[in-house]
Amino acid sequence: MVPGIHRPAVVKVNLGAIKRNIENEMQHLEPGQKMLAVVKANGYGHGAVEVAKVADQIGAAGFCVAILDEALELRRADITKTILVLGVVSPEYAPIAAANDISLTVPNLEWLKEAEKYLENSDLQLKIHLGIDSGMGRIGFNEDKDFIAANKFLENNDNFYIEGMFAHFASADSSDETYFKHQCEKFNHMKSLLTVKPKWIHVDNTAASIFHNGIKSDLVRFGIGIYGLNPSSNPNSPDLKSKIALDPALSFESELTHVKTIHQGDGVGYGSTFVADKDTIIGTVPVGYADGFIRKFQGFKVKVGNTYCPIVGRICMDQFMVEMPKEMPLGTKVVIISDNPDDLNNIKAAADYVDTIHYEVACLLNDRLPRVYYED
């Protein structure tokens, strides 16, 4: 998708906030513990390369992404530290990963056997992390016999270097620790079955690190916290108070491109879902659902100048309209999503409005919106 550099709509990312969040977490780590910065999905919409470079400078041990292409993007940007692909990569691409020093997740024994076929006639060695399904129900080993067989397969197998073993918590963002503890027990049990020694054992994500005393592990996979966002949907719960300060880094801004007065009975937008009951001032903003600002945001209040104004009518593919209490000049700044947690249109409020999580709101903002980076 072509970035709209000739349109007044941008996602602003404060690299100063990114830096502070990473530094705060690194100060919170246990002695000897390291951090993998999670920059998948284009850094949760913030920009993977730019965020990775900040984390690299501060001292992150490496990076996590979701797919092989994201890892290759970091390598092309001269990121040289460890990069782990958390998702399942087709075994046929194992040589590409190995040639680029990219670590892959092993979901099961069958994957290992297939990957070996592509590696055995080369001089390449693939770095792997053994994935454990401790209760997420997604990918990884969950049966003892299969994990034991995989360990046996890897013994004295020069095609693979066992760099890590990991799992992912399903409910570390909950104050009820019952399932969290169940997952800890399952992971520790699977760890006891190891006959090969990984370089790194890791299970803590952002939520586990800032809310709980998780498993003693070599690494913390720090994801949503990098971007200054609380992983909990209930951050005001006293049981889920973050152990570190989090500084939101993203704002989404545009401006008024058209202002007019409509009259009683006039409709706004497709289907005329808003009909004026009196003379009403309407402003148009050049952003729509094609940018990832979905139609469910109809009615959400954005900040036009210093005034919160509701979105009226259905959000269009490329534009939306707001009802304003007074006429404002063309070019007036419109903050659609604020990086100030005290503002009514912060990203958590936006997520709540459309009944989702702020992860999704940030990730929805696509490449048609240019990213502008600054440091406060």
UniProtKB/Swiss-Prot annotation:
| UniProt keyword Isomerase present | yes
Pathway listed: Amino-acid biosynthesis; D-alanine biosynthesis; D-alanine from L-alanine: step 1/1
Q: What SMART domains does the entry give?
A: Ala_racemase_C
- The residues responsible for catalysis, as annotated, are 40, 270
Swiss-Prot/TrEMBL GO biological process terms: D-alanine biosynthetic process; peptidoglycan biosynthetic process
Gene Ontology MF terms: alanine racemase activity; pyridoxal phosphate binding
As its record notes, the protein acts as a catalyst of: L-alanine = D-alanine
Main EC class the enzyme belongs to: isomerase
Residues modified to N6-(pyridoxal phosphate)lysine: 40
Q: Which UniProt keywords apply?
A: Isomerase, Pyridoxal phosphate
- Positions that bind substrate: 138, 317
Q: What is its EC number?
A: 5.1.1.1
Cite a GO CC annotation: cytosol
Please state which protein family the record places this protein in: Belongs to the alanine racemase family.
Q: What is this protein's record name?
A: Alanine racemase
Which source organism does the UniProt entry give?
A: Lactobacillus gasseri (strain ATCC 33323 / DSM 20243 / BCRC 14619 / CIP 102991 / JCM 1131 / KCTC 3163 / NCIMB 11718 / NCTC 13722 / AM63)
Tell me the lineage of the source organism.
Answer: Bacteria, Bacillati, Bacillota, Bacilli, Lactobacillales
